[in-house]
A protein has these predicted regions:
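Active-site clefts of carbohydrate-active enzymes
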Residues: 119-120, 170-177, 262-293, 308-310
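Noncatalytic carbohydrate-binding groove/subsite architecture in carbohydrate-active enzymes
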Residues: 224-239, 247-271, 277-279, 292-296, ...
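A eukaryotic intrinsically disordered, low-complexity regulatory tract that is acidic and Ser/Pro-rich
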Residues: 539-577
Length: 577
């Protein structure tokens, strides 16, 4: 039987990339679970090991970092003293990682976002700054990128390749987020810019006999289409890596529409295990069946690789390895080999590897796997009904909005679902029907959570007492988080409902519910504050933030002062006033 995906990678995205013990843990998981690649994802990872030497006085014939350093150390010390020695230390570290991975048949890839560079180049190349804005169209950048990747593969010849995202504003400079108004930028189209940048990367990578993958990580449908146009002009050996959902890792979104639409190029599809937008594992959100379906469609679209991200660049010191969401990584590894593997088998493998069972017997695996499925199988439903509303993203990377305007900016602008599913354009409009649906979602989600949590009172034989105690603690924390999120989103949607004209009966009922919702927010903020005296991982207190809840309440109270004026205006529906 053939494997689901030929290429199965674990991706590290946080500063754990530079933590040897964490990288070894990832390599151990890859080996144990039959994966075959490690992706080290830091936006500046190439710039952390390459100066490049050419711009500091290195000779053309220099072929490694020490030869280059011998001709550049004085200039480096003058212009960038803190960066003088760091690159050759990090180069040795990464060479060791690549060598260790090769021993077990695992490829190592870099992933980044371009353009990225050290600020010293703005001093060395003053033409790059024009009227206070950085210019992405200056020819220097394309020369710089080509030199950077030439030196990279001289330093790390064992590196399998590079995955890059040229279409996001999260790089230091991109045509996508360009604020320069010079003549060069006026003439430069996104398609031309992407083509020139990708070409500058591809030439040295291909010359080294290695591979380049380009991501379609973009923030809008228009940007995705502009980048897709550049794909058509890329050399045939460049592949495309696509998030499984468009824009970002939102499990409520449809499949990324570019999957299967990249011509004959190799394709990878990317998944997030930790849960940047679905609770960080502080609220477990296990996505086994969602992923099984998405992977099946990806296989039908001739996708050959799958990537599973374990952490996030903006949340250092946290990882899927620290939470129940590690189940997602096991799911990715196992489904990536065989889409028919049963859900209970994935849970059992997670429990065995986490040493949660008294003994690794077929009987205990079966009993504990089935129990874990009943405990966690609907966990995504509970998160979906609190952090989302009618499938729209009402969370700021799993944190609660800080105010009224912030919430709708997140849901309808920054993370717009309507951009990818036009039927959702009015999903959050302040109507009675939408309000009822959103409030019901909160109630049903919390009920799902409580039914699942009841399994903790009926543990299976073979489960260690310590494992059960840990799960009980996790669920107590999750309960607080979901209750806080449900209260916050109830208050937000009631505030929006009251912010426009409504019939008198609906307004009176809405006002009563809004007042209760604000009281709930206050009570939960007090509970969160008391909980601060406990001792858990820092990310727990980031999500259970009393200060954040109180900020939201204060904003909504200020907003409520305008409700009386709104109530005096005629209702669009012509209702009673």
């Amino acid at each position: 039987m053939s494997e689901t995906f030929r290429f199965r990678a674990l991706e590290m995205h946080s500063r754990f990339v530079w933590d040897y013990d964490r990288v070894r843990r990832s390599l151990d998981f890859i080996h144990a679970q039959g994966m075959n690649a490690l992706i080290l994802h830091r936006n500046d990872i190439v710039d952390r090991i390459v100066w490049p030497g050419r711009y500091f006085g290195a000779r053309e014939e220099d072929r490694n970092i020490f030869e280059r350093y011998g001709h550049t150390f004085r200039t480096l010390y003058r212009y960038t003293p803190t960066r003088r020695s760091g690159p050759y230390h990090r180069r040795e570290y990464l060479r060791r990682i690549v060598e260790l991975a090769a021993r077990q048949g695992v490829e190592v890839w870099f992933q980044n976002k371009e353009l990225f560079f050290h600020e010293v180049f703005l001093e060395l190349q003053p033409q790059l700054t024009k009227d206070g804005a950085l210019c992405p169209s200056e020819p220097f950048w394309f020369e710089f990128v080509e030199q950077k990747y030439t030196e990279l593969f001289q330093e790390l010849p064992g590196l399998a390749g590079v995955v890059t995202a040229p279409g996001t504003g999260e790089s230091r400079l991109s045509i996508t987020a360009n604020r320069c108004r010079c003549a060069l930028c006026a003439q430069m189209t996104p398609r031309e810019w992407y083509s020139r940048l990708i070409g500058a990367m591809h030439r040295p990578i291909a010359a080294a006999g290695r591979s380049l993958m380009v991501r379609d990580f973009v923030f809008s449908k228009q940007a995705q289409e502009e980048l897709a146009a550049a794909f058509k002009e890329m050399p045939a050996d460049i592949g495309v890596s696509l998030k499984n959902t468009p824009h970002d890792y939102y499990p409520s979104f449809p499949d990324n529409p570019r999957i299967g639409r990249v011509g004959a190029r190799r394709q990878w599809v990317e998944f997030d295990c930790m849960g940047q937008y679905f609770g960080w594992g502080i609220a477990p959100a296990v996505l086994i069946e969602d992923w099984r379906a998405r992977m099946g469609r990806a296989v039908a679209a001739e996708v050959e690789g799958a990537v599973f991200r374990t952490d996030w660049e903006s949340l250092d010191s946290h990882s899927a390895f620290e939470t129940v969401n590690l189940v997602n990584l096991h799911a990715g590894a196992m489904l990536g080999r065989d889409l028919s593997v049963p859900e209970t088998g994935i849970y059992a493998e997670w429990m065995v590897r986490q040493e949660m069972l008294e003994a690794d017997t077929p009987e205990d695996r079966a009993a504990c796997g089935a129990w874990a499925e009943r405990l966690l199988g609907r966990s995504w439903e509970a998160v979906r009904g609190t952090l989302y509303a009618r499938d729209c993203v009402v969370n700021d990377s799993s944190t609660i909005p800080v105010g009224f305007a912030h919430a709708w900016w997140l849901a309808e602008e920054k993370n717009s679902l309507a951009d990818w599913d036009p039927s959702k354009v009015d999903a959050l409009a302040p109507t009675e029907e939408n309000l009822r649906a959103v409030l019901l979602e909160r109630d049903e989600a919390l009920a799902v959570f409580e039914r699942s949590a009841s399994m903790l009172d009926r543990p299976p034989p073979g489960l260690k007492d310590a494992a059960l105690a840990r799960l009980r603690t996790d669920f107590e924390i999750c309960r607080r988080y979901l209750q806080g999120y449900a209260a916050a989103t109830r208050a937000l949607f009631l505030a929006r409902f009251l912010s426009v004209p409504q019939g008198s009966a609906a307004r009176a009922e809405g006002q009563e519910k809004f007042d209760r919702a604000l009281d709930d927010v206050s009570a939960l903020a007090d509970e969160f504050e008391r909980f601060e005296s406990t001792d858990h991982r820092p990310v727990v207190y980031t999500l259970l933030s009393a200060e954040r809840l109180r900020c939201l309440r204060a904003d909504l109270e200020e907003r409520a002062a305008t409700f009386m004026d709104v109530s005096l205006r005629p209702s669009a529906a012509g209702g009673e006033h």
